[in-house]
């Protein structure tokens, strides 16, 4: 799992 600005999981 990557921490992206778009993905907030």
From Swiss-Prot:
The modification Pyrrolidone carboxylic acid is found at residue 1. Expressed by the venom gland. Keywords: Pyrrolidone carboxylic acid, Secreted. It is found in: Secreted. It comes from the Eukaryota. One of its GO terms (cellular component) is extracellular region. Belongs to the tachykinin family. This is Tachykinin-like peptide-IV.
